[in-house]
Amino acid sequence: MSNGYRQTQGNRFSRSVDHDGAALDLEIDVLIPSYTDHLESNQPFGDLVVDAIPGLSTAIARRPTVVHVITTLTTGVELAYTVPLPEPISALCMKAYAYRWRFAERDALDIWRVLEVARKVGLTVADWPKGATGRATARILHTHFGTPAARGPAMATADKAMQTRIRALVLAVVPRSDT
C-alpha cells in the first residue's frame, strides 16, 4: 500500500515511523456511512471489512472546515499541513450517535465543546440539516442534553450553571426533533 501502510485489521492500516529514535505507530481506520441510526461493525466493503458510522453521511455531504496547521515536533522539525475537519453540525451529528451508543463522559464533553463552537460561529437551528439524520440527531441531542432531566450535561460537567448553559446551547443550535 502507498506510504508504507499495511493492513493490520479489516479496516485498520498501520505504519511505523522513527520519532526521535523511538518507533511511533501511525494508524488509519477506514469508515463508511451507516444509513441506519446505529453503528454497524464489520461490514463488508469491497476487499475490506469496515465499521459503518451513523452521522458520517452528513459530514461527507457538508462543506468541511479547512484548518491550516503549523506544528513543531519535539525533535524541532516544523510541519505545515492542511486538514479538512467536520464542521460543527457534522461533528455534533457524529458525536450524538457516539454518545448514544457509549454514554461516555468524553463524548458528553465533546458535545458541549462542539455546541460552544457552533454557537461561537453563529450557527442556529436554521442551519441544521433537514433530512432523516438531522431529525434523528436532533432527537438524540434534545433527549440527552436538552432537558433538565437529561444526563448528558451532568456527564460533561459538575457545574450546574454550565449544565444549564449546555441545555441552552442545544435549544439555540438544534431544532426540536418534533418539528
Go through each PLM region and give its residues.
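Compositionally biased terminal segments of proteins
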Residues: 1-179
